[in-house]
Amino acid sequence: MYRKSALELRDAVVNRELSVTAITEYFYHRIESHDEQIGAFLSLCKERALLRASRIDDKLAKGDPIGLLAGIPIGVKDNIHITGVKTTCASKMLENFVAPFDSTVVRRIEMEDGILLGKLNMDEFAMGSTTRYSAFHPTNNPWDLERVPGGSSGGSAAAVSARFCPIALGSDTGGSIRQPAAFCGVVGFKPSYGAVSRYGLVAFGSSLDQIGPLTTVVEDVALAMDAFAGRDPKDSTTRDFFKGTFSQALSLEVPKLIGVPRGFLDGLQEDCKENFFEALAVMEREGSRIIDVDLSVLKHAVPVYYIVASAEAATNLARFDGVRYGHRCAQADNMHEMYARSRKEGFGKEVTRRILLGNYVLSAERQNIFYKKGMAVRARLIDAFQAAFERCDVIAMPVCATPAIRDQDVLDPVSLYLQDIYTVAVNLAYLPAISVPSGLSKEGLPLGVQFIGERGSDQQICQVGYSFQEHSQIKQLYPKAVNGLFDGGIE
């Protein structure tokens, strides 16, 4: 059963080949049998999920119409609210916080009869690219348990890679869907800013955050977006970008002009560079034309991103003070000490580092030097993308400079920040991008290529990703690191 895509599972439900209860129980069995080695989940919603599965089976038995996601098990990153379920953001600060309402994406998924399996691990408050900054436990890469799955949506990518669920929700602030998708050999889609509601997402960087799906195939990205994309009155930043459905758009003619910022590829590991050019060759064989585009301003993207993201994080996380929200220290002599001790005990080192950086760049003495100049460079970066899209339909770039790194290779914070060089610009410019598996490194680890489009061109970007997937014949990669995960046992 794990070999079926989300679409195939839904077809099996519609054709009465499988019950929703049987599907749900099967995936819980996989999680309970193997997740101890991987650590993708923080909590499970088993009783709730089986109850919903039973109700959907009853609807089927009565001949009632069923939703777009009927019978599809879905994992949810633990910064997205599900009513009555803990939302911890993988932080001691929110260890006991129970969500009082559903996020819009969760509400729309359940309206379409999707089954929510549980909450997935992440870097604390979505700050990180290794899922080693979770306060509770690390998540391991199913391809090599000594390597990181990427982050911050590492639990989401690992869960899909291990086939614990065919769809998982992640959030992408600077590459947090695309990078772990590439590291774990799955598809990851970062929608345009405003394409998917952020209502019920715990904010990290409010002008950068976007919820999106991770899946095994591009068709399931389209299915998920059809279920939950679109305007939401509870999120004033959302817009109605799309005509028709994502699923229908996959069959349309693929754009022919693909831009590549060749001057921006020098930092790639050699086999990653070879793989990227092989991916371009696939698109050329199918009739696309590759042209050079000038995106030299991207060299400023990482510092600008960490100025803007840290400033927004410091502002958003100010509410977690032990009074309004979050952990409160057991003892303090005065209010100031209570604030300080509660935040020191509640936040991990990486979150603390970014809050300090954010407060520094927003300080009266430094705001003009850092934050305002950073926003000016952000505007230049947006202009550079717009100029590039006047010459091409889509931009292709690598997702990462290397395959997934080992634990012992986790570098100092600044070096880790620099690894975001191929992903953060997309968020700064509000653009959509899809990461699609593009093959394996010399060490047998998955690699990914990303296709980037203009804001609102999400359907076109999924279409390009689907075309690459079909013509590269790189589809449904199965990791080998966990014994019994794909050989033997129930199927």
UniProtKB/Swiss-Prot annotation:
It catalyses: L-glutamyl-tRNA(Gln) + L-glutamine + ATP + H2O = L-glutaminyl-tRNA(Gln) + L-glutamate + ADP + phosphate + H(+). Its EC number is 6.3.5.7. Keywords: ATP-binding, Ligase, Nucleotide-binding, Protein biosynthesis. It is an enzyme of class 6 (ligase). One of its GO terms (biological process) is translation. GO terms for molecular function: ATP binding; glutaminyl-tRNA synthase (glutamine-hydrolyzing) activity. It comes from the Bacteria. The keyword Repeat does not apply. The active site is at K77 (charge relay system), S152 (charge relay system), S176 (acyl-ester intermediate). It holds the Pfam family Amidase. GO terms for cellular component: glutamyl-tRNA(Gln) amidotransferase complex. Allows the formation of correctly charged Gln-tRNA(Gln) through the transamidation of misacylated Glu-tRNA(Gln) in organisms which lack glutaminyl-tRNA synthetase. The reaction takes place in the presence of glutamine and ATP through an activated gamma-phospho-Glu-tRNA(Gln). NCBIfam families: gatA. Heterotrimer of A, B and C subunits. Belongs to the amidase family. GatA subfamily. This is Glutamyl-tRNA(Gln) amidotransferase subunit A. The gene is gatA.
